Amino acid sequence: MMTLTLVSFLLFVLKAFVVVMFAMNVAVILTWADRRQGAMIQDRVGPNRAVAWIPTKVAQGLALGPALAVIAGVAFVVLKLEPPPEELGARAMLFSQLGIFCTWLTGVVIGGKVQNRGVTNSFDAWLYSLGDPRRIFYGGLFVHFLALFVGLALNDSAYGEQVRTIGYGTGVGLLVLSVLAGAAYAAISINGEPRIGLRLAGLLHPAADGLKTIFKEDFIPPNADKFLHSLAPFVSFFPALVVMAVIPFGDTLCFELGKDGSFGSLITTMPGRAMCTEGAIRLQVVDLDVGLLYFFALAGTGIVGAALAGWASDNKYSLLGGVRAASQMVSYEVTMGLTLVGAVMVYGTLRVDQMIEWQSQNAWGIFVQPLAFFLFFTASVAESKRIPFDIPEGESEIVAGYFTEYAGMKFAMFFFAEYIAVVTSAGLMSAIFLGGWDLPFLYRDGLHVTIGQTLIFEQALPHLAIVLIGALGFVLKTLVLCWLQLMIRWTLPRFRYDQLMRLGWRKLLPASLANVLATGLIVMAIVTGGPAVATFMSLLADYSKALVALAGIGGFIYFIVFLVKPVHKRKSLASTSAQFAHAAGGTRSARMSA
């Protein structure tokens, strides 16, 4: 019992660390993306000027180290974790696709460098002769589909075992060779350089800004309340971070239990809809019966932080910003809570993990509560106090709102808390409306594409692979919702204060009340409808999964086309000053360095 308690505590600490790192790192990426987007729209230098200079030997080690670690991991899986015969096909498909992916990705990256830098050796000359690196990408896609088609077509034939064995060995070989070749090429290409500058597309710039704020002066106005002035950033920062604790980021991991109650090996396969009760590790920090109430209770304390900052700063602009922030957050939290009442009526629980389980067995919440999703999304953007709802910090009206008298690390905590709030709201929307870790037709024993009683395709998958795919799906859904909130910032102008209040109290609040009424009537009609209605709703749920799957495939194809499409920059001379500068020959610009 003591061992199990210690293990549970260590797992709690590990899961909390993973959730905190996920929220904070995504917030850093959002900061970077926000600045990059602003630089592209305003045609100015973006956050790619922060450079970390490191010795060449260290850079070569950074190139070879991860590659050797990946190779060691692959060798361990191949040599120590021999798959049973029924799992050989799935593992062969996985490694063959990974090997093909790493091969063409390495070729595209090196080919792009050669096109920009020029030819330095015979290998560069061969890559240069291929022309546009996009050709390597298109060839890689063709090989992906060819390997997938051959594997599925010959899996149950007389040559199935040979195909699985060849695919497994070839995939492992391609993966190891491509990773090692790419790392070796990077290490050799920088040999002889005195030092190497790491930019990482500007991702180092937010880190440099964070370090800079630590050493800045911590200014406190002379007549300010020093205790409350220092307390306010912490009251805003930590609640935004800990609300992620109730959001599951993956399905349950199931382990075998020993005779003494200790955890054994991971279960390899699971029945379709079964749930393990013993030896289960939930990918969720805390599983509360009132998880949704916990989220809103802690998220609402951010109002206190904004109000304290405005009151304690001894500044009229800060006070106005604090009052605006408090009124705005209170107004839109009412709408956020009411929009989820309909979802709670449908799911019949306040536990977030059970909401996801309901969606995995029926349909995603966005199909069950479409109006609630859009209302909640709008209210969550307003709750995060970002454009077009950044009334509390409107620069043209009240300088910087309740941020005015803050500097250094305290200002950074306020600033960072806003981006973390974007991540947490996106995670909650993903769990309640987009199925969380659930993906269409992916069950606990594998992939089963069925419409009604018709089975179209099925493929058994290992338990660990299904859990990892689900966790990756949750991360992608959260990132997409964060990206949508980021795009709104650079698309819509700021509302006036009266427009903001009118939207919340006269538009969103009545719509959320109407949604609660409509949901109650529809739920009563379905419950009393009998077996025919239940069968019809089940068929609609299958069609909704098919729609999501097709939309996901279409979105992936569009994203790939967007990435490989040549960029054509077009300036829009909207202002008279821009037109005058263009007529005079343009403005001088140069890459900045830090």
Segments the model singles out, each with a brief description of its role:
Residues 2-594:
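Selective transmembrane helix interface/packing segments
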